[in-house]
């Protein structure tokens, strides 16, 4: 259940629970980067997010978070998924990611989402 009144927006760092999952999907309670617009989430109750792992192993479709943010680790851009913000626990983790980092994440998303 989302904190009262909070609607995730692009660039927010949040905590959520990704369970249940299947196969190699990221699971469990973990931070994530919101990549969908606030208006989308407000109208649909869904947020598109990229999970974050604390195990940093640079991979072409991942982005390491810079120091100084409230969450440390690596954004798993290739694990992008939508979550139901009304059915899953969603907690704001802190400040929005810097614009240059958001641009890198966007470019990596575009590199493999080609429709």
Predicted regions and their residues:
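Conserved functional hotspots at enzyme active or ligand-binding sites that engage polyanionic ligands
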Residues: 1-115
């Amino acid at each position: 259940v989302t904190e009262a009144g909070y609607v995730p927006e692009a660039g927010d760092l949040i905590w959520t629970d990704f369970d249940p999952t299947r196969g190699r999907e990221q699971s469990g309670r973990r931070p994530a980067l919101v990549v969908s617009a606030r208006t989308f989430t407000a109208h649909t109750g869904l947020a598109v997010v990229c999970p974050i792992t604390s195990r940093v192993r640079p991979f072409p479709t991942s982005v390491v978070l810079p120091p100084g943010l409230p969450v440390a680790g690596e954004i798993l851009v290739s694990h992008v998924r939508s979550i139901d913000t009304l059915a899953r626990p969603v907690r704001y983790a802190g400040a929005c990611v810097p614009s240059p980092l958001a641009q890198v994440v966007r470019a990596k998303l575009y590199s493999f989402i080609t429709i």
